[in-house]
Amino acid sequence: VPRLQRRVAVSEGRSDIQRLIDVDSEPVVSGQYVVTTSFQGQVTVLDLATQRILWSENSSSINRPEVTDGKVIVSQTDGQIIAYDLITGQEIWENEQLLNRNLSNPVLLGSNLVVGDLDGYLHQIDLNSGTTLGRAKTSGEVRTLRVIDNQLYVSTRKGALSIWQSR
């Protein structure tokens, strides 16, 4: 029996293609909040305590968002990275330096964010300002990032796995 059901993505547009939406990423639970993203849809924060949508903003992402330090960080399908306030939904910063680079999910490594791209680069981004701090080359197009015990696990589209450690 479902405890809670809510629509987290609403389609818009005139044609069937424009109205196509898809929830490809896994939801992120942070305290009493659940954060979801959708392709050609929205980034949505649901408050489990009230069982209501706290806020929703138009966004297109196929990646799992990162939720940390009161921020929701989304890597959009166009390559823009946006940080929102977890409670208000207000945009804190945006980074447009990686447009059209088919970004991976953002992750927190140490005190900074990391995203991967189609050219096999890992980009380090300041969590508070969105400024790009540096980059490193991997073995191929980055698909998924995961951080466990301060180590960055990088998987590529061609099946390679590399493990990086924060300095």
Predicted features and spans:
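Residue-level signal for well-ordered, solvent-exposed loop/turn and beta-edge residues enriched
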Residues: V1, Q51-R52, Q90, Y121, ...
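Extracytoplasmic beta-rich repeat domains
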Residues: R3-V28, R52-D69, I92-L109, R135-D149
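Short coil/turn segments within WD40 beta-propeller repeats
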Residues: G41, G79-Q80, D119-Y121, G159
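WD40 beta-propeller blade core
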Residues: T44, I82-A83, H123, S162
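Short loop/turn segments that connect beta-strands within beta-propeller blades
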Residues: D47-Q51, D85-G89, D126-G130, S166-R167
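Blade-level signature of beta-propeller repeat domains, shared across WD40, Kelch, NHL, RCC1
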Residues: T132, T138-R167
